[in-house]
Swiss-Prot record:
Coiled coil: 95-158
Null allele phenotype: (Microbial infection) RNAi-mediated knockdown results in reduced replication of duck Tembusu virus in salivary gland after an infectious blood meal. Reduced release of duck Tembusu virus in saliva. Up-regulation of antimicrobial peptides in response to duck Tembusu virus infection. (Microbial infection) RNAi-mediated knockdown results in reduced replication of dengue virus type 2 in salivary glands after an infectious blood meal. Reduced release of dengue virus type 2 in saliva. Reduced transmission of dengue virus type 2 to the mammalian host.
Protein name: Salivary protein SG34
Record's keyword annotation contains Repeat: no
Organs and tissues of expression: Female salivary gland (at protein level). Low-level expression in ovary.
Swiss-Prot/TrEMBL keywords: Coiled coil, Signal
Species for this entry: Aedes aegypti (Yellowfever mosquito)
Protein induction: Blood feeding does not affect expression levels.
Length: 312
C-alpha cells in the first residue's frame, strides 16, 4: 500500500469507529432541572395537600415535566393525598382520634415541604452536577411522598374498619341513636363491608334493617337490600355454615319487606328473592308448618313462610 493510501486509511479510521459505535445519547433524566419557581410551586402544592386542598391544575409547566418525566404523576399523587386528608378531616370514629391523626400527617407533609436536602440548592455548583443532584432530589421526594400516601391510606382504611365495628356493637346493644353519623358515612362508602359484618349475626342484621327502615330513605333502603341479596347469592351452597347465613339473611329481608315503605315495590329485588328462595329452601315448597323458616323468623308476619311455600 502506498504511503498516501496508508495516511487516508488512518484518517478514515476514527470516522468509521464513531459511525459503528455512536456516542450514547444523554439520559433525559440527567437534563432534569427545576427553577426556583418550580421548587416554590412544589412546596406550595405539598402545603395545600396538608390542608386537604388539592391543586386544580398541573403544578408544573409542560416543559418542566418533559425534562423531568418522573414528576408527571406527582400531581395525581398529591390529589390522592389531599383527598385522603379530607376524609380524615371530615369523618372518623371520634373527633379527637381523627384530629390527632390529621395533625400528624399535616406535620409530616409540612416537614417534607421544608426539607432542605430537596428544596435548597447549593451555590456555585456546575450545571451537570446540579442536574444530577436534582434527579436524586426528585427521586427522594417521590419516595417520601409515596411512603406518606401509603401510610395515610392505611390509616383511613383502619378508620373505616373501626367505624363498622362500632356500628356492629351499637346495634347489638340496640343503641341506634349513637350510630347516626357513622352509619351515614359507612352506608355511602363501605356498605359491602358493613353488611359482611352484620350478616354473620341475624339478630344484629334485623336491628340494622329496622334502623334503615326508620330513616325512610328509599335510596339507602334499596342499597342495603341489594347488598344483602347480592352477598347471599355469592354464598356457597355446599358449605353448611354459609347456607345458614343465607337462610337467616333471607328471612330478615322478607320480614323487612312485608310492611316496608322504604323497599316497597322493588320488583327486581323480588325476582332475586324468588330465585334465592329456591336455592336455600328447596325442601320448603308447599310446606304446611314450614318449620325451618319459622324457626328463623323474628317478625310477627307470615311473609317469610309465604315466600318459601310458594318459591322454595
Amino acid at each position: 500500500m502506498s504511503p498516501s493510501k496508508k495516511i487516508l486509511v488512518l484518517l478514515l479510521f476514527p470516522i468509521l469507529l464513531v459511525s459503528s459505535h455512536p456516542i450514547p445519547a444523554e439520559d433525559p433524566a440527567k437534563q432534569c432541572n427545576l427553577s426556583e419557581d418550580d421548587l416554590t410551586k412544589l412546596k406550595a402544592a405539598i402545603s395545600s395537600a396538608s390542608s386537604a386542598k388539592a391543586a386544580n391544575e398541573d403544578i408544573l409547566p409542560s416543559t418542566t415535566l418533559a425534562a423531568c418525566p418522573m414528576l408527571k404523576n406527582f400531581t395525581e399523587m398529591l390529589k390522592t393525598v389531599a383527598t385522603d386528608m379530607e376524609v380524615l378531616k371530615t369523618q372518623g370514629v371520634s373527633n379527637m382520634e381523627v384530629q390527632l391523626l390529621r395533625e400528624s400527617f399535616e406535620e409530616k407533609l409540612n416537614d417534607l415541604a421544608k426539607n432542605k436536602d430537596i428544596f435548597e440548592r447549593q451555590a456555585n455548583q456546575d450545571t451537570s452536577k446540579a442536574e444530577g443532584e436534582m434527579v436524586e432530589k426528585i427521586n427522594k421526594l417521590q419516595l417520601e411522598m409515596a411512603k406518606l400516601q401509603e401510610e395515610i391510606e392505611e390509616q383511613t382504611k383502619q378508620m373505616y374498619v373501626d367505624m363498622i365495628e362500632y356500628i356492629f356493637e351499637r346495634l347489638k346493644m340496640n343503641d341506634t341513636e349513637a350510630i347516626d353519623s357513622y352509619a351515614q358515612i359507612v352506608m355511602k362508602t363501605k356498605m359491602h363491608e358493613l353488611i359482611m359484618k352484620l350478616k354473620t349475626d341475624r339478630l344484629v342484621l334485623w336491628e340494622m334493617v329496622k334502623y334503615v327502615e326508620g330513616k325512610k330513605n328509599k335510596w339507602v333502603g334499596r342499597k342495603v337490600l341489594n347488598t344483602i341479596l347480592d352477598q347471599v347469592n355469592k354464598l356457597k351452597l355446599y358449605k353448611p355454615e354459609e347456607v345458614e347465613i343465607g337462610k337467616n339473611s333471607l328471612v330478615v329481608v322478607w320480614c323487612w319487606k312485608f310492611n316496608s315503605e322504604t323497599v316497597y315495590g322493588t320488583t327486581d329485588e323480588d325476582q332475586k328473592s324468588f330465585h334465592l328462595a329456591k336455592l336455600f329452601f328447596p325442601k320448603e315448597k308447599g310446606c304446611k308448618e314450614c318449620a325451618d323458616v319459622k324457626s328463623r323468623t323474628m317478625c310477627n308476619n307470615d311473609y317469610p313462610k309465604v315466600m318459601v311455600k310458594a318459591f322454595g
